[in-house]
Amino acid sequence: MPKEVIVESFELDHTIVKAPYVRLISEEFGPQGDVITNFDVRLVQPNQAAIETAGLHTIEHLLAKLIRQRIDGMIDCSPFGCRTGFHLIMWGKHSSTDIAKIITSSLEEIATSITWEDVPGTTIESCGNYKDHSLFAAKEWAQLILKQGISDDPFNRHVTS
């Protein structure tokens, strides 16, 4: 008989969250005592908006670089299939507030100063779908998200600065 599992993100009531926000999903502890933290980086309101793939793809590539420039320990930042945000996996303990500030700073850079030459992994050799990028869309979404502010609480708006 298959093992019964609960996938936390499918237990979250997506109708009561208030995006954009950063939410600590879990802290996992390894056998040697090491800690991995998993965050829900929700950029748009579930079931009301979705970032089209080209813009999301470009944001993904930029966050892979920009987050690592701002904090050590990033393992991965992968988009949700629903296209409303990302899972951010980190080594060590981190707060939602600190991660929200890092995401805000990264989106500010995307919105204001990133050029096409700054986007990593946009060649046929470095990306599995290199034609599906849009810096224009990434900048537009970054501006829209920043206008709302990123909260460190998924249920009550508490925008970090």
Curated annotation (Swiss-Prot):
It comes from the Bacteria. Fe cation binds at residues 57, 61, 127. Belongs to the LuxS family. Binds 1 Fe cation per subunit. Homodimer. This is S-ribosylhomocysteine lyase. InterPro entries: LuxS_sf, Metalloenz_LuxS/M16, S-ribosylhomocysteinase. It catalyses: S-(5-deoxy-D-ribos-5-yl)-L-homocysteine = (S)-4,5-dihydroxypentane-2,3-dione + L-homocysteine. GO terms for molecular function: iron ion binding; S-ribosylhomocysteine lyase activity. Involved in the synthesis of autoinducer 2 (AI-2) which is secreted by bacteria and is used to communicate both the cell density and the metabolic potential of the environment. The regulation of gene expression in response to changes in cell density is called quorum sensing. Catalyzes the transformation of S-ribosylhomocysteine (RHC) to homocysteine (HC) and 4,5-dihydroxy-2,3-pentadione (DPD). Its EC number is 4.4.1.21. Its cofactor is Fe cation. The keyword Glycoprotein does not apply. GO terms for biological process: quorum sensing. Keywords: Autoinducer synthesis, Iron, Lyase, Metal-binding, Quorum sensing. The keyword Metal-binding applies.
